[in-house]
Amino acid sequence: LTLWGNGKARREVIYVDDLADACIYFMKKKTKEAIINIGTGKDYKIKEYANMILKKIIPQKKIYIKYDSKKPNGTPQKVLDINLAKKYGWHSKTKFSDAILKTYNHFIKKNAI
């Protein structure tokens, strides 16, 4: 597996069902806020994501990760301030490890992998 840059850039990800849940939640809530950040509030290094995904979907194999230093690292960190969402009572429900399996199984079921 080859990752761009050094794999140290940090990213926040959210499972699609949690995002959909947040959209419905806040449409029903009818807040006066123009913008409410939706996220998990947790970020990991890209190389950590890669390792977590590999361990979940192919735990029996050792996959080596290479880093392509000719490619950019990207912005050092992308994580949202989700305090306003929490204030209104919303939080993501799906752990990243569960999201990996749900997503992987969906792709297998649809013969997309």
Briefly describe each language-model feature range.
Residues 1-113:
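C-terminal substrate-binding subdomain of Rossmann-fold SDR/epimerase-dehydratase oxidoreductases
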